[in-house]
A protein has these predicted regions:
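N-terminal glutamine amidotransferase
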Residues: 1-77, 81, 111-221, 225, ...
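ATP-dependent adenylate-handling active sites, centered on carboxylate activation for C-N bond formation
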Residues: 8-15, 111, 133-136, 144-147, ...
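Short histidine
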Residues: 20, 68, 78-131, 259, ...
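A generic structural signal for nonpolar/aromatic side chains embedded in well-ordered alpha-helices
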Residues: 24-27, 92, 109, 118, ...
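Residue-level signal for inorganic ion chemistry
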Residues: 31, 80, 105, 192, ...
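Short, polar/flexible loop-turn hinges at active-site or ligand-entry regions and domain interfaces
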Residues: 91-97, 112-116, 173-183, 336-339, ...
Length: 439
């Protein structure tokens, strides 16, 4: 897990580097292994990166990553994992200059442009790409990786301001307040182009017009013969989910663990991870569950762990411990939403435990399936399949505000990287292509 930070200053005032450095440091929990902050005095741009190394564990792979092509230099900061980077290098016959999977973004852009680059990436990401004439900002389709930006108050003088991008809301708040700005979520599945040659007022208009590159591929009509292909759909679900887990398992150089609540979602993911892991003849994968004494979740997680043969740890907490940790949780997830805070407490405490007692850095979870597959209890009350489909679309479009925010920040705040196979682009696209009646 990593954290990105960038400020483009269009103010008449110079950026005070020391103050910016203090704010940037607030996001270090996401990337405790290396932090860099660069200030380009000529362009009045600040670029920062907190790194948790998952691939390319050497200093050469630290960010920002720069690539020179002819007379032009391209630089990138990216919080993400690109699962198909090796296949893309082979396709383009390009040799990378680092071992970072994110470097592929630069090479794709140089050859294909930004739109095609975003279509070809299989992964989760939030990045800022600095090119000779433009700056591009983009976020993955479902907002698995967080990204915020500054927005001017409509009544404020538009000429005096900054544009800021960050993985952590807390790193931009004071800076934005100085310029009477708001800090908002960058819309998932979109990108922004900033032309370096145009004025700030025009740039502000462009920021409002983020361009969408991804729209969920929902089934478009009711299928009258839904029962004829049930077995093929089940095979397809199995294939695509296993593929989603496999690519996330193989794209890491750090130890892996799984969250295991005892529910169907996390149990499926943990079972697939264990199945892949056993074929490597390695020690059993670590799984973790948390709950109150005599919790039903703890009991079911124990049963699943025994069945899949994992090295299981149960973290038993009291109600008071859960209440006491709430201020820390709110600080970590950067949300006061009651449901999100409540749901984050367990993940936050597990992340804290793993950081202290395990070498695991990549943490699999079962998040995203309830939104995708209608797992919430109220979904059974949908009047018809069309309304069910509409509600699923709403949940997926908003998932970055709630469950994905929770699953990322409650884990990443401890210097760990969560991985969410149920929100794999290929798996989601396949699942949503299944007739509504079967979903």
């Amino acid at each position: 897990m990593c954290g990105i930070f960038s400020l483009l200053n269009y103010s008449t005032n110079k950026i005070e580097y020391t103050k910016v450095s203090d704010e940037f440091a607030k996001g270090q929990g996401r990337g405790p292994e290396n932090s860099t902050l660069f200030h380009d005095n000529a362009l009045n741009i600040v670029t920062g990166f907190h790194r948790l190394a998952i691939n390319g564990l050497n200093e050469v792979s630290n960010q920002p990553i720069s690539v020179v092509a002819g007379a032009d230099r391209y630089s990138l900061i990216c919080n993400g994992e690109i699962y198909n980077y090796k296949q893309l290098y082979k396709l383009m016959d390009v040799t990378p200059t680092t071992d970072s999977d994110c470097e592929i973004i630069i090479h794709l852009y140089i050859r294909y442009g930004i739109r095609q680059t975003l279509r070809m990436l299989d992964g989760v990401f939030a990045f800022v790409l600095f090119c000779p004439n433009n700056i591009f900002v983009a976020r993955d389709p479902y907002g698995v990786r967080p990204l915020y930006y500054t927005k001017n108050d409509e009544d404020h003088n538009k000429v005096n301001g900054i544009i800021g991008f960050t993985s952590e809301l807390k790193t931009l708040c004071k800076i934005a307040n100085q310029f009477n700005q708001k800090v908002l979520q960058f819309t998932p599945g979109t990108f922004l182009t900033i032309d370096k040659t145009i004025d700030f007022e025009r740039i502000l208009w462009l920021i409002k017009e983020q361009e969408r590159y991804h729209i969920p591929a929902f089934a478009s009509s009711v299928n009258e013969n839904v029962n004829e292909n049930i077995s093929s759909y089940l095979e397809g679900i199995n294939y695509h989910l296993r593929a989603a887990v496999t690519k996330r398992y193989t794209t890491t150089e750090r130890p892996i663990a799984c969250l295991l609540s005892g529910g169907l979602d996390s149990s499926l993911i943990a079972a697939i991870v264990c199945d892949i892991h056993k074929k490597q003849n390695l020690a059993p994968i670590e799984t973790y569950s948390i709950g109150l004494p005599d919790s039903e979740d703890i009991k079911f997680a124990r049963m699943v762990a025994r069945h899949i043969g994992s090295n299981h740890t149960e973290i038993i907490v009291s109600e008071q411990e859960m209440l006491d940790i709430i201020p820390e949780v709110i600080q970590a997830i950067e949300s006061y939403d009651t449901t999100t805070v409540r749901a984050s407490i367990g993940n936050y405490l597990i992340g804290k435990y793993i950081k202290a007692h395990s070498s695991a850095k990549v943490i699999f979870n079962g998040d995203g399936s309830d939104e995708l597959a209608g797992g919430y209890l109220y979904m059974s009350s949908c009047p018809d399949s069309v309304e069910y489909d509409k509600e699923t679309m709403r949940l997926l479009n908003d998932i970055h505000l709630f469950d994905v925010l929770r699953s990322d920040k409650s884990i990443s705040s401890h210097g760990l990287e969560p991985r969410t196979p149920f929100l794999d682009r290929g798996f989601v696209n396949y699942y949503l292509s299944i007739p509504i009646e079967l979903r």
